[in-house]
Amino acid sequence: MDLAHTRTGSGEPVLLLHGITHRRQGWDLVAPLLAGEREVWAVDLPDHGESPDLPPEYTGDIGPLADAVEAFCRTQGLERPHVVGNSLGGLVALELAARGTVRSATALSPAGFWSRAGRLWARAVLGGAHALLAPIPSARLRQMLATPFLRTALVGLLLAHPSRIDPDQITADLHGLSHPRSSFRTMLAHLDSWTVPQRAAVPTTVGWGARDLLLPRSQSKRLRRALPDAAVYILPGCGHVPMGDDPALVAELVLAATRPRPA
């Protein structure tokens, strides 16, 4: 599958994966901070952004997304890149780490480490946000996001500091949630089928937003039990999408996680 992507920088390759209904531009504030030391590939996952659709028989699980990323790497000649993912992209990154097909994995507030209540909460928030945003024309949404109070009300569950993101950027980011592609409903209906890896074959780092309201940082305890060798850090002042809240902190974490390790 030929995934839409943006490439910049030079050095060891780092693949950046976004969350559900998001897009590769969600990494725009982080990518320039990495590009001086890494070759950065920001990628739209299948059925997101400008990438092709998933097949009609897609059942909502993670495996086909990881398969598509692996196929993309083969097509681009990327041999075992580092991979970094947020939310859904974080779970895909951990799946690739379990397969051993990447050099290292960094996951930011990865999905899947929820209890039943946490899973129902995530489904309710995402489904409710879609229902709220779908009837609002883009121009009207842009006007609403220009108001600090409404911007916080609309995206405060995703960002701890919504004021740090340009309203035009947020409007574009929310398009995938207000007008999602077919996999969105399939994924929401089958969140209980998302299995989390029980091993990592490569060095693995996790950053969890201290102020994540969608997937609270308490879920990191489940991750620690599943992946005891992972290095887990709590990201102060960050919500569910830390790339928007503190791009410098995220870049620092990624650069540290992707530095060559002593043999």
Regions flagged by a language model, labelled:
Residues 179-225, 234:
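Conserved serine/cysteine hydrolase catalytic core
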Residues 90-100, 105:
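Short glycine-enriched nucleophile-adjacent loop
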Residues 140-198:
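Conserved alpha/beta-hydrolase catalytic His-Asp/Glu region
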Residues 238-251:
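Catalytic histidine-centered segment of alpha/beta-hydrolase-like enzymes
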Residues 4-53:
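Conserved HGGG/HGGXW glycine-rich cap/lid loop of the alpha/beta-hydrolase fold
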Residues 18-20, 81, 85-87, 209:
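Conserved alpha/beta-hydrolase "nucleophile elbow" surrounding the catalytic nucleophile
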Residues 102-137:
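Flexible "cap/lid" loop of the alpha/beta hydrolase fold
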Residues 8, 41-88, 252:
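Active-site loop/oxyanion-hole signature of alpha/beta-hydrolase fold enzymes
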